[in-house]
Regions:
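Hydrophobic packing positions in regular secondary-structure scaffolds
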Residues: 1-259
Length: 259
């Protein structure tokens, strides 16, 4: 688990810059994750029975009426909390009646750890529309949280609709499962990876991110990344080595640097 990723996710949940949380320096990634989930679950823990009752009441109502209540009366925050108690077939039907803007607002309020089943059941076309809307507004932290739980096949299809390579890296910036990101990256074409590499080396934070992703790849995949990096710029691997040594992950990139 990457500590910096978890710190960024906690900062987003608290609506504070990560730099302001230096009083948490003694906490490791697991402790930061626990703190974040406790904070995100606090409202649900307090009002869970209320949200469950509202969701239960809506089970018998026609989907069109339930959808109107969600968008016109409850709003995105209550709808997000109700979603954890709504039968999955009902939730999927309602989502088909929501526009992408409202779905994106609901996504911003949801707790990623509680959405795995919903992400597995929602049609990928709906997820693509929500993703496009969140990318449009720069909500990379929201997408990063969901990336840890969305089925890999769907995640790969969604990556295809994100045209800006830097956006994919910004999303990864907030994803804890770098191993899953590495697997998805390895499924991309050489052309796509070259675009990602070029975007990464234009921003120091993204260069670190692509380094952490490459750390999770096997030797063969690292060698492929090395060759593609050289195609972009033969000086880039030297820059990557300096940053990796500074950040302490150079020993995990032996195949990348020796290729």
């Amino acid at each position: 688990m990457d500590r910096n990723t978890e710190l960024r996710r906690l900062a987003q949940a608290l609506h504070k810059p990560a730099e302001s949380l230096n009083y948490l320096d003694k906490l490791d990634a697991v402790a930061l994750q626990k703190l974040r989930t406790q904070f995100q679950n606090s409202l649900l823990n307090k009002f869970g029975p209320v949200f469950e009752k509202i969701a239960s009441t809506g089970k018998l109502a026609p989907d069109s009426i339930s959808a109107t209540l969600c968008t016109k009366v409850f709003g995105p925050a209550i709808t997000a909390n109700m979603s954890y108690f709504t039968p999955m077939n009902k939730a999927v039907s309602l989502c088909k009646l929501f526009d992408a803007d409202f779905m994106a607002e609901v996504a911003r309020e949801q707790i990623p750890e509680r959405t795995a089943t919903m992400l597995a059941e929602l049609p990928v076309d709906q997820l693509k529309k929500v993703t496009a809307k969140l990318v449009e507004h720069g909500d990379y932290h929201v997408l990063g949280g969901f990336t840890d739980y969305i089925p890999e096949k769907k995640a790969f299809e969604i990556m295809e609709v994100i045209k800006d390579p830097a956006a994919n890296l910004h999303i990864s910036f907030y994803a804890q499962r770098k191993d899953r990101i590495a697997k998805l990256a390895n499924m991309q074409s050489d052309e796509k990876l070259i675009e990602l590499i070029a975007a990464a080396f234009s921003d120091e934070q993204l260069m670190v991110e692509v380094g952490l992703i490459t750390c999770e790849m096997d030797a063969k995949a690292q060698e492929r990344m090395a060759k593609l990096t050289d195609k972009v710029n033969k000086e880039y691997r030297s820059q990557a080595r300096s940053k990796a040594e500074e950040m302490g992950y150079a020993d995990r990139l032996k195949a990348y640097f020796s290729a």
